[in-house]
Curated annotation (Swiss-Prot):
Family of this protein: Belongs to the chaperonin (HSP60) family.
Taxonomic lineage: Bacteria, Bacillati, Actinomycetota, Actinomycetes, Kineosporiales
GO biological process, alphabetically ordered: protein refolding
Protein name: Chaperonin GroEL 2
One of the Pfam families matching this protein, by short name: Cpn60_TCP1
């Protein structure tokens, strides 16, 4: 495919036009009085959202240079969403302000590389101030306030705070669609995985169709069990102990399964067989997790352990195991706390190293099952469009709350950036183009607050000037139009969100300013429609 090339000012202005179109569509959603954006879908009902990254993803521009500019800003929103789960609109507004101010200075003759260095130093100084000013999140109310602001709904904030309180910061909170109207929270006690009993004959509670075994031994096996002779020596030892047995294996079939079922029906011996969760390497890892949690070992020929020679000390223990037809829950495994902590550290290191979103998600689930627990928020709404929008808001708010617990909170509403900037720029001593670069940041960090004010029907410049001179932590409550102590009023943002938004916006802005040429695909002319005539069927009716 042939290419087109633009140089110098033409290249940068083309990128800026694309960025402005995307940013202008996104920034109307910022703040408590921000509006929604309707996104048309190729199939199904349109989506209504106020989430910056969702809007950005939908924007495809026709002009090749504008398209590249928009794609670069999409990257800001996506990266901020990946890291912090929120702040995508703030990041987009900051990127637009940094680029606008930066290009003005480049056009006036400033050296782009000098500006880039100045921007980087200023952002580092502001980030340092933000982290220094962050308040640790210690109460449920603080989490509820943060999540409530992100979701735009205090009741969602309270539910998320309740969920985090139960499962801990390592726990997993998932959001599911509900058939009923409103919100509900469902908590999982212990480790749960999505495999149920192999045979319904194992059921101990016919009414609830589940098997519940108290204080069982747990056999964890990385292979199939088909013949009873392999299992018999271990079965006899477990029967002598008087405890029930849970078998987690690749599969249990044939006479081995028949023997277990017959003994269960006769009341001789209580047991349940469950297929191991996952596939391939992930199955191995999850069996290892179950072994660590219950204080047992995975019986596998790879490590020289065989079923027919296994002893009771290789089996795991738990206070209770509950098995339904679809899932298994292990409550209070008897694993060593240090071993579990070591395994958690190992999984966390894998998450850091992984560059696949899918792998990261699966590792996060494993981490939650070991370290915390799982909470499910079920959301319902009147229409499918509203339900999707609500579910998305809750997912964002969950990540926002976790970010708050991780690094702490700062005053919300765009105020923290301005007030951190006031302190940072007092200490910053730069000259020449680097000083100009720092000044670009000084002007740009006011953009989120100004946009929040504009969306609330106020004059952005007047509000920014007033906030700059207020005591630290005081600012505009855009919902009421009053100037208050924001942290005291529960208006806060996770510092991770604010910091990520600024750092990612500055990174893309520096790319814009130092661009001297843009090479894009030449737009293809649409092929003319074939004319109808005698040779074809163009003139015929069907």
């Amino acid at each position: 495919m042939s290419k087109i090339i633009a140089f110098d000012e033409e290249a940068r202005r083309g990128l800026e036009r694309g960025m402005n179109q995307l940013a202008d569509a996104v920034k109307v959603t910022l703040g408590p009085k921000g509006r929604n954006v309707v996104l048309e879908k190729k199939w199904g009902a349109p989506t209504i959202t106020n989430d910056g990254v969702s809007i950005a993803k939908e924007i495809e521009l026709e002009d090749p240079y504008e398209k590249i500019g928009a794609e670069l800003v999409k990257e800001v929103a996506k990266k901020t969403d990946d890291v912090a789960g929120d702040g995508t609109t703030t990041a987009t507004v900051l990127a637009q302000a940094l680029v606008r101010e930066g290009l003005r200075n480049v056009a006036a003759g400033a050296n782009p590389m000098g500006l880039k260095r100045g921007i980087e130093k200023a952002v580092e100084a502001v980030t340092e101030q933000l982290l220094g000013a962050a308040k640790e999140v210690t109460t449920k109310e603080q989490i509820a306030a943060t999540a409530g602001i992100s979701a735009g709904d205090a009741s969602i904030g309270e539910l998320i705070a309740e969920a985090l309180d139960k499962v801990g910061k390592e726990g997993v909170i998932t959001v599911e669609e509900s058939n009923t109207f409103g919100l509900e929270l469902e908590l999982t006690e212990g480790m749960r995985f999505d495999k149920g009993y192999i045979s319904p004959y194992f059921v101990t509670d016919a009414e609830r169709q589940e098997t519940e075994l108290e204080d069982p031994y747990i056999l964890i096996l990385n292979s199939k069990i088909s013949t009873v002779k392999d299992l018999l020596p271990l079965l006899e030892k477990v029967m002598q102990s008087g405890k029930p047995l849970v078998i987690v294996a690749e599969d249990v079939e044939g006479e081995a399964l028949a023997t277990l079922v017959v003994n269960k029906i006769r009341g001789t011996f209580k047991s349940v067989a469950v297929k191991a969760p996952g596939f391939g390497d992930r199955r191995k890892a999850m069996l290892g997790d179950i072994a660590i949690l219950t204080g047992g070992q995975v019986i596998s020929e790879e490590v020289g352990l065989k079923l027919d020679t296994a002893d009771l000390d290789l089996l795991g223990r738990a206070r209770k195991v509950v098995v339904t037809k679809d899932e298994t829950t292990i409550v209070e495994g008897a694993g060593d706390a240090d071993a579990i902590a070591g395994r958690v550290g190992q999984i966390r290191a894998e998450i850091e190293r992984s560059d696949s979103d899918y792998d990261r998600e699966k590792l996060q689930e494993r981490l939650a099952k070991l370290a915390g627990g799982v909470a499910v928020i079920k959301a319902g709404a009147a229409t499918e469009v509203e339900l999707k929008e609500r579910k998305h808001r809750i997912e964002d708010a969950v990540r926002n709350a976790k970010a708050a617990v991780e690094e702490g909170i700062v005053a919300g509403g765009g105020v923290a950036l301005i007030q951190a900037g006031v302190l940072a720029f007092e200490k910053l001593e730069l000259v020449g183009d680097e000083a100009t670069g720092a000044n670009i940041v000084k002007v740009a960090i006011e953009a989120p607050l100004k946009q929040i004010a504009i969306n609330a029907g106020l004059e952005g410049g007047v509000v920014a000037e007033k906030v700059r001179n207020l005591p630290t932590g005081h600012g505009l409550n855009a919902a009421t139009g009053e100037y208050v102590d924001l942290l005291g009023a529960g208006i806060n943002d996770p510092v991770k969100v604010t910091r990520s938004a600024l750092q990612n916006a500055a990174s893309i802005a520096a790319l814009f300013l130092t661009t001297e040429a843009v090479i894009a695909d030449k737009p293809e002319k649409a092929a003319a429609a074939p004319a109808g005539g005698d040779g074809g069927m163009g003139g015929m009716d069907f």
